[in-house]
Amino acid sequence: YFSHRPKEKVRTDSNNENSVPKDFENVDNSNFAPRTQKQKHQPELAKKPLSRQKERLQRKLGAQDKGQGQSVLGKGPKEVLPPREKAPGNSSQGKDLSRHSHSRKSGGGGSPETKSDQVPKCDISGKEAISALTRAKSKHCRQEIAETYCRHKLGLLMPEKVARFCPLEGKANKNVQWDEDAVEYMPPNPVRIAFVLVVHGRASRQLQRMFKAIYHKDHFYYIHVDKRSNYLHRQVLQFSRQYDNVRVTSWRMATIWGGASLLSTYLQSMRDLLEMTDWPWDFFINLSAADYPIRTNDQLVAFLSRYRDMNFLKSHGRDNARFIRKQDLDRLFLECDTHMWRLGDRRIPEGIAVDGGSDWFLLNRKFVEYVAFSTDDLVTKMKQFYSYTLLPAESFFHTVLENSPHCDTMVDNNLRITNWNRKLGCKCQYKHIVDWCGCSPNDFKPQDFHRFQQTARPTFFARKFEAIVNQEIIGQLDSYLYGNYPAGTPGLRSYWENVYDEPDGIQSLSDVALTMYHSFIRLGLRRAESSLHTDGENSCRYYPMGHPASVHLYFLADRFQGFLIKHHVTNLAVSKLETLETWMMPKKVFKVASPPSDFGRLQFSEVGTDWDAKERLFRNFGGLLGPMDEPVGMQKWGKGPNVTVTVIWVDPVNVIAATYDILIESTAEFTHYKPPLNLPLRPGVWTVKILHHWVPVAETKFLVAPLTFSNKQPIKPEEALKLHNGPPRSAYMEQSFQSLNPVLSLHINPAQVEQARKNAAFTGTALEAWLVGGTWTAMDVCATGPTACPVMQTCSQTAWSSFSPDPKSELGAVKPDGRLR
C-alpha cells in the first residue's frame, strides 16, 4: 500500500467508532488461549509442537469424513461448499454482488459465497489456521476455513494490485462549517434521507423511542433486524405497518461484532434502496438502536442540503501503517459459525491508499450508487478484499471513496459524538466472537449531557445509549430537543425490556430461568390468594396453566425493580382461563456488619453472572443462578488508602467454599473475581462475607436455585440427586477451609447437612416447596383481560405493569408538522 498524505498527529478529540484506541498499544490481539467454558477441544493443544497439532487436527477431521474416501480438505460427492468467486481479479464478481431485489432472502454469513469445482488442497501449516480449525464447532465452518486458507496460500483469494481512480495526489478533506443561524432557514429543495437502522437485541421500547425522535414523513426508514433477534423483528414488523415510508428487510443476517456480515448488510441495503424507485432519497445514514439524535431533523436537513455533494466519514487520525497494524488489515479473517476466525497474514494490495475509522457514516446517493453497482477494478477488488477483513465497515467505504473518482467529496467528520472511555471499553470483551482484542464505546450518563450542548461542531447523533443502563440521559436529551412531556405523563421514569416472549419457545430459556419464572408464578398466585381472597370465595384463587407467556425486566428511575411474569391461569371459582401479570422484586441482601466496623471504603457488594466490565454491572439482572453456574463476586469502593480485604464464600450448610484476599488500591472503584469453584454448587442461600483484618465489614447473600426443570422437562430424581447435592465430598476446591469455621463462628450442624442431603432428592411439589420463598417478594398481581376476581386490578391501570401506558415509546399518528415527537 502507499499513503498519499503525511503522517498526522493523533487528534485528542477523535470520536471514531473503530476499535483502534490510542492507548491500546500493548494488547495481544490474538485469541488462541483456551476458552473458559468447557469444550471438547483440548486446551493444551496450543502448547504442543505445531506438527503434533496438525496430526491431531488431521485425525479429528479425518474421522468425520471416514467412509467417504476423502482427504481432510476434500469433500464427498454430495457435500458442496458454498459458491465463491474463482479468483480475485474476475470482474464478474461485482455483478454477483450487485443487483438483487430487496425482497431477496439471505443467510447470515458475512463472506461472499464461493463456487469451486475442485476444493484446493494444501498443507495447513499456519498456527492461526490450525487454531481456528481446532476451535470451530461445525464441519461446514471447518471446511470453509480450510478452503479459504488454501485458496489464499495458492494466491487465488486476495487481489495483489488495485487501480486508483482518484485524480488527487493526496487525501481530500473538505471543511464544512456549522452555522447555528443558517440552518434555521429551510432551503427550497431540502434533501431527503434514507435512514438504515441495523438493530439487534430485545430493547424494542428504546428502539421505538429513538425512531420516534428521528421520524419525519419526508424521509425513508429501512430496518434490518439481526436474524437471531426474532422478538425484536416481530415488534419492528408491527410498528412499521403504520407508516408508508418504513420498510423492513425481508432478508436477515447475523451481524456479529467485527464481522464481515455487517458490511454485507450495508451493501445489500444500499442495493435495495437504489432499486426502490418510489423512494427518492439523497443521503444514506446508518444508525443502531443505541443511537439518538442530538439536533433536530430540521437542523440536519438544512445542513445536509447545504453540503449535498459531500460524503461524511470519520478517519482514524493517525498514520496509515499504524492503523493497518492495529486494525489487523494485514491479516486474513473469515466469518462462519457467527465468529471471525483469524487465519494468517496477507499483503495490502498495491496501488491504493488504505484508510479507515468509524463505521458510522453519511453517504450521498451518487457515491452509494458507485459502491453498490460499479464493476470497476477498485470496487470489485475491494469487495473481495474486505469480505475477509475484520471490522470491514470501518475501512471499506473510506478506502473506496479515497481512491475513487468521488475522492474530492470526502469530509473527515461523520457528524457523531461517540462516548469513548478506553480504560473501561477496551477489556477484550469480544474475544468469544472475534480472534482479536476490540474496544467498544460506553453508554452515556446524565453527567455527559453538556457534551450535546456544544454548538461549535456539526454533530447530529450520539452513541451509545442504553435505557437498561441509564434512561435518564435519554429523557434529558429528548426534552432538550423537543420539549418536556405534559405534567402528569405516565411512565416517563419507567423502563420495560422483554427477556422472554411465548413465540420464542421455552427452548430459548435456560433451565434456571424457567425454574425461577415458574416459582415466581406460584409466589404471585399465593399473594393473590392471601391478599385478595375472602372466606368462602374462590373468585381470586387460581391454578397455574403451562409455561410463562412473557417476561419483562422492570426499572424505575434507573433502578432494577424486578421481573414481570405474564402467565395463564384457571380461575377456580368459574373454571375459566385468565391471564395475569405478577411483579416479583428481589429482597435486599447486602448488609453492613453490626456493629459497623471502622472500615468505610466498601459501598456495596453483589454476586451474579455476566459481569459487564465496561458498564460495571451484571447483565444477569436479578442474579438468577443454578447449581452449574459460575458466580462472580463484585465490590464497589469509595476512595481511600490502599487496603487488603478478605472475601469468604459460605455455602447453605456453612461449608466454606472459598476464601481469598483482594488488594484495594486507593483509586479503585470496583473489584470483581470469579472463584474457581467445583460444581455443582449446593442449592440454597449462600453468603459472601467481606472482612478487614478479620473483622466483619459486610456480607451479601445470593440464591443458588435447585432446578425443577432439566432440558425444559420436569427434573427426574436421578438428575436432581446429581445436581442438588453439592460437589463430591463438599469440596469446592482442592484446599479445605474447614479450620476457619471456628474463627468465623460458622458451625456446621449435622442435622442441617442431613436435611440438605434429603432436599437433593426432592422432585415435584416437594422440590417446588423447597424452592419458593427467601430472596424474592411478590409485590403485586394484575389481570391483562377479563377476570372473575372482583378486586383484581387491570394491568393497564397500574403504574408498574408492562401493559401500563408508556407514551414516550408509543408510536401514533403523524402530526401536522410531519413528526411523531
Curated annotation (Swiss-Prot):
Glycans are attached at N90, N286, N642. PANTHER family: XYLOSYLTRANSFERASE 1 (PTHR46025:SF2), XYLOSYLTRANSFERASE OXT (PTHR46025). It comes from Rattus norvegicus. It is a single-pass type II membrane protein. Disulfide bonds join C122-C150, C166-C407, C426-C439, C428-C437, C540-C789, C782-C795. It is an enzyme of class 2 (transferase). Pfam families: Branch, Xylo_C. InterPro entries: Glyco_trans_14 (IPR003406), XYLT (IPR043538), XylT_C (IPR024448). Its cofactor is a divalent metal cation. This is Xylosyltransferase 1. Catalyzes the first step in the biosynthesis of chondroitin sulfate and dermatan sulfate proteoglycans, such as DCN. Transfers D-xylose from UDP-D-xylose to specific serine residues of the core protein. Required for normal maturation of chondrocytes during bone development, normal onset of ossification and normal embryonic and postnatal skeleton development, especially of the long bones. Keywords: Disulfide bond, Glycoprotein, Glycosyltransferase, Golgi apparatus, Membrane, Metal-binding, Transferase. One of its GO terms (molecular function) is protein xylosyltransferase activity. It is found in: Golgi apparatus membrane. GO terms for cellular component: extracellular space; Golgi apparatus; Golgi cis cisterna; Golgi membrane. Its main location: Golgi. One of its GO terms (biological process) is cellular response to heat. Residues 27-36 have a biased composition (Polar residues). UDP-alpha-D-xylose binds at V198, D226, T255, I256, W257, D359, W360, S440, R463, K464. It catalyses: UDP-alpha-D-xylose + L-seryl-[protein] = 3-O-(beta-D-xylosyl)-L-seryl-[protein] + UDP + H(+). Belongs to the glycosyltransferase 14 family. XylT subfamily.
